[in-house]
């Protein structure tokens, strides 16, 4: 049996329902409206997004993860990154983050920033693995439940 192959590609509007399904499956993510996703996917000049698509032996493809980020001037901000729970810790998140960092560098960003719930240790450790550092905090940044956020950043100026 052939192993499953993951392909990272630019997200399309037709992917929004699947992106929302993945996002909604994780409690720690801020849940966006469908209109927010349409606005972001229509803004190619500043916002980029990728999906991870499994190419299965049967020939069917399924989206199992996504990353959405915004580049303005020399800063790229990761808005959201998630992988379907059944594929967590499989390396797909790493592929998505690598694609976002590479695209940010290609578009002349000098650093990547993001916010993460202070209690989300798996995500914090994931970002530390990319050598993000904790640059600050935002008090009461998240709601449902109210929680502070770490601001993390990665220098990609080299």
Model-derived segments and their meaning:
Residues 10-86, 97-99, 103, 107, ...:
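Acetyl-CoA-dependent GNAT
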Residues 49, 110, 117-121, 130, ...:
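C-terminal "cap" of GNAT-fold acetyltransferases
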Residues 80, 84-98, 105-107, 111, ...:
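Conserved glycine-rich acetyl-CoA-binding loop
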Residues 6-8, 132:
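Generic structural signal for residues in well-ordered beta-strands
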Residues 31, 90-91, 146:
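Non-catalytic, surface-exposed connector residues within folded enzymatic/regulatory domains
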């Amino acid at each position: 049996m052939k192993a499953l192959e993951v392909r990272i590609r630019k997200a399309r509007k037709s992917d929004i329902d699947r992106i929302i399904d993945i996002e909604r499956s994780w409690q720690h993510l801020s849940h966006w409206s469908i209109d927010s996703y349409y606005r972001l996917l229509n803004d190619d000049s500043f916002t980029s997004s990728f999906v991870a698509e499994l190419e299965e032996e049967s020939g069917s493809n399924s989206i199992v993860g996504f990353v959405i980020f915004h580049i303005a001037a020399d800063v790229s901000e990761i808005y959201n990154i998630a992988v379907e729970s059944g594929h967590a810790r499989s390396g797909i998140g790493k592929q998505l983050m690598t694609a976002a960092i590479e695209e940010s560098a290609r578009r002349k960003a000098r650093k990547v920033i993001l916010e993460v719930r202070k209690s989300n240790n798996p995500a914090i450790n994931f970002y530390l693995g990319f050598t993000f550092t904790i640059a600050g905090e935002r008090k009461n940044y998240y709601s449902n439940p109210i929680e502070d956020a770490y601001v993390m950043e990665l220098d990609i100026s080299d």
